[in-house]
Amino acid sequence: MTYTLKLYEADTSEAQRNAAERRFRDALETSLGDESLVAPVYSAYQRIVATYGEAPAPDSLTAAEREVFDQWQAAEAAALAATFGPHRYMGDAMYEIGV
């Protein structure tokens, strides 16, 4: 299963955006272990969030759901840090993953 990635960042050139997308992909794939794991883990994470919300109570998830939830959040944090650095919580930069 493959995935697409699109970064939305104001005031960047196409070359800068492409480089940022590569950093995001590299960090995400490294954190999850392989490119082939991004789409299924993200899809599972999306189902968990749709069922339990953005911040589910720890005891509401099964062990497997908690593992997927935690893995995705860690991978996402690593990708955001690699892409946007210490200012990742400031500004209008956003991303979209398609599966």
Predicted regions and their residues:
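Hydrophobic beta-strand residues in large extracellular and virion-surface proteins
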Residues: 3-7, 24, 28, 50, ...
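Short, extreme N-terminal segment that most often corresponds to the first beta-strand
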Residues: 1-23
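Amphipathic alpha-helical binding modules
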Residues: 76-99
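Short, solvent-exposed secondary-structure capping/transition elements
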Residues: 16-18, 36-37, 89
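A structural detector for beta-sheet-dominated domains
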Residues: 6-8, 53, 98
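Short, intrinsically disordered low-complexity segments
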Residues: 29-78
